[in-house]
Design a protein with these regions (language model features):
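Contiguous, well-ordered alpha-helical segments that form the cores/surfaces of helical PPI scaffolds
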Residues: 308-321
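Conserved catalytic cores of very large enzyme subunits
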Residues: 1-304, 325, 329-338
Length: 338
């Protein structure tokens, strides 16, 4: 098991590659900051957040680092690690998700969670780590357009307003500064969503792996992305002979009959994707039942906890191909709702 920030960051990065190589889907660390905090406390004490500007290196180090620098170094190790291409994934990076929480989400999910030494995570610790990570991701993206981890902010509301006003303001400020993350709004803080996946019930939260992670399990076992631009152009250029080879198609000139044909063409593709997802997940269930999935054997994740995901890209380009203006107009919204 890891015993400091560096070894924890290295093992979590390796775990992302391990899990994604077995399922070819998206790995979600819904408890990254809770686990990360355990090793920060082990190195710098319970109130490390009050000592961020204190020097943590000795006179023997060429590079002088503060406690904040040392913590960010571990975060960078994880961020840069999961953005490396992997040979067993056709040289793609492992699709990695990380969740942020407001105070009420944190209390609901981790109020009764204990670390191996009997201590408990404190909100001030997690809050500080989340803000540091958020700022670090934004700064790194000014240098390099990194993809992962995809981050999702989970906020609790009462159907009228957000309960944690500080995190409501934090989200607005980060978006205004150019931060990029999803936001999941819920009136039920026992459920969790990451990236494009639907919510996952978190009330059964019992297992802790050797990485120090909690029992929060979420992710995707398979991701298939539909390129709407490619599908649209294929149909109107090749399938529907009324528009064969025509690169100047206008949305308003498409007949209702032809639009119905396009919808059927899209549905046929979706049905093939559904069948592939079902077949692939059935195979994973069979492997799991036979004890052939190391991730399940180790208790990291179970196939029933994983979603089969359909991604969508190319809507804007498809609309432009059909001569639509990309703004808040009736025809564009109509096309998006096909």
């Amino acid at each position: 098991a890891p015993n400091d920030i560096a070894s924890f960051s290295g093992q979590v990065t390796n775990l992302a590659f391990l899990l994604s190589s077995q399922c070819k889907g998206a790995v979600a660390f819904g408890d990254y900051f809770v686990a990360f905090n355990y090793y920060v406390v082990k190195e710098f004490g319970e109130i490390w957040y009050e000592k961020l500007n204190c020097i943590s290196t000795s006179e023997h180090h060429i590079i002088s680092r503060t406690i904040k620098d040392s913590i960010e170094k571990g975060m960078k190790q994880f961020i840069w690690g999961v953005n490396q291409p992997a040979g067993n994934r056709s040289y793609n990076s492992p699709f990695t998700n990380v969740s942020w929480y407001d105070k009420y989400y944190f209390k609901s999910l981790f109020e009764d969670f204990y670390y191996p030494d009997g201590s408990k995570p404190k909100w001030k610790q997690i809050d500080t780590l989340q803000r540091m990570f958020m700022e670090l991701m934004r700064k790194i993206r000014l240098i390099k357009p990194i993809t992962f981890p995809v981050t999702t902010m989970a906020l609790v509301h009462n159907n009228k307003e957000y309960l944690d006003n500080d995190y409501k303001e934090l989200c607005a400020e980060e978006w205004a500064k150019g931060g990029s993350f999803f936001c999941y709004n819920s009136d039920n803080p026992t459920s969790l969503a990451s990236c494009c996946r639907v919510l996952n019930e978190m009330s059964d939260n019992t297992f802790s792996s050797t990485t120090g992670m909690t029992g929060v399990m979420t992710g995707s076992c398979n991701v298939i992305t539909l390129n709407i631009n490619r599908i649209t152009q294929d149909y109107f250029r090749t399938v529907d002979t009324n528009y064969f080879g025509n690169s100047g198609i206008l949305y308003q000139d498409i007949t209702e009959e032809d639009m119905d044909g396009f919808k059927k063409y899209l549905i046929d593709i979706l049905e093939r994707v559904y069948k592939y997802h079902i077949a692939y997940k059935t195979m994973l269930y069979e492997l799991e039942d036979k004890g052939m999935l190391a991730a399940s054997n180790g208790g990291y994740i179970y196939i029933k906890k994983l979603y089969s995901t359909i991604g969508v890209i190319g809507y804007t380009e498809a609309a432009q191909f059909l001569g639509l203006e990309i703004n808040n107009n009736k025809e564009y919204k109509e096309f998006l709702q096909l």
